[in-house]
Amino acid sequence: IIAMENHPVRWTTPLGLPVVQPYRKLGRHLIKTSLQILTLQRETDKVMVKRQRTAFPPNFVHSLDGSHMMMTAIACKESGLSFAGVHDSYWTHASDVDQMNKILREKFVELYDAPILENLLESFQQSFPDLQFPPLPERGDFDLREVLESPYFFN
């Protein structure tokens, strides 16, 4: 919907980091010299509608994963734990794994207890007041707090 209006899809993560999908159509510019012809490719002002649409779901989920990682890293630091991570792999000293597992579950519940989709829709509506967005799906009945007791939630 947004890309069809020639705007890149953008949102703000739960931690306040702005994200803008950079996918724009490329244009060619020929430069002729006495020795050769060079072709330069540059982004145009037109967005790639299909790429904006297909990239948004995984990019949005990755931004939530990154928010969860940062929340976990900050909480580990505040608890005196060493923390390292790449994508969805989190590391600490072997003696601190149980404490880190507890922290990452707590931060997951904290993150997803927030009205993430509601906030996303509201930001889209504020940024594009003339566009009509579909309603959000209803929330399911899963008790997010079950994650706190799940031994295999994140392992």
Swiss-Prot record:
Catalysed reactions listed for this entry: RNA(n) + a ribonucleoside 5'-triphosphate = RNA(n+1) + diphosphate
Pfam families linked: RNA_pol (PF00940)
Protein name, UniProt field: DNA-directed RNA polymerase 1A
Coiled-coil ranges (or none): none
Gene Ontology molecular functions: DNA binding; DNA-directed RNA polymerase activity
GO process annotations (BP): DNA-templated transcription
Active site (record annotation): D88
Entry keyword set: DNA-directed RNA polymerase, Nucleotidyltransferase, Transcription, Transferase
GO CC aspect terms: DNA-directed RNA polymerase complex; mitochondrion; plastid
Gene source species: Nicotiana tabacum (Common tobacco)
